[in-house]
């Protein structure tokens, strides 16, 4: 099969190449993509050439030309002779690149796929793998029901962190971002309150709303190292801070006694790949990758996990470079971007 695949050729340059995919081997599944979704943080880091993995010699796949994307939905068209449980015509979610078709090797980290509920459309399902990174805030927090939660940074990962916390029963849930459109999207999804940090000290605004000394749970989804101490300041004494956005770099200053130790905060990381760990480990509690993705698909299908206000652009593959420019420079217009292949 001939497939079209988006590649970041080098920093700030995106192209489309055609690749011949062979028939599936015995442990492979061929999927035709209907929709793929853009993970702004990861893809912009590669597009700008700043992603740290591009410079890691132990990760040879992370180099230019690089095929971006890790969240897609489509239809199985062929299965290898050794595959059971899958058949042509199955509608699936999978960690796919931005490509018109993909050959998945079962057993490989990116060779996983999950069946879609009958009432879930491809566009919504295309976001499920990205949503897992936001779900990490609720998973790492453990108890969420009835706990106050603030989400700092309302890009695509922050939106999913906020929406998953709402679905998990946190209350009240507060979104914090300087971009009005992002705050409105959070409100559309059910946020109890939103805060504009450019209008005044975010900590004071949060405490005024809660009537307490901070939130019991804070999710930092900014991807900015210096925002982690800010997130810590938003938490109440004894609260939890979960870092769900990838903070590439070093924070300028953290006073570990005053900001962390004396306040007995718990600060944890929640990269989505933690769910590849066995379910019994303390990292994910009762969760693993398959349970998380099935929950997300079911929650999307039922409406428990809202996509209200999230998708702002539906584009052709040829328009991905322009979308990257918009995500970088027009944050008041761009939030969720999906690529339509059919």
Language-model segments: what does each one mean?
Residues 71-96:
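A glycine-/small-residue-rich N-terminal strand-loop-strand element
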Residues 96-108:
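A structural motif shared across PLP-dependent enzymes of the aminotransferase-like
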Residues 212, 242, 249, 253, ...:
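C-terminal capping/lid region of NAD(P)-dependent oxidoreductase domains
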Residues 19-72:
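N-terminal glycine-rich beta->alpha transition that marks the start or flank
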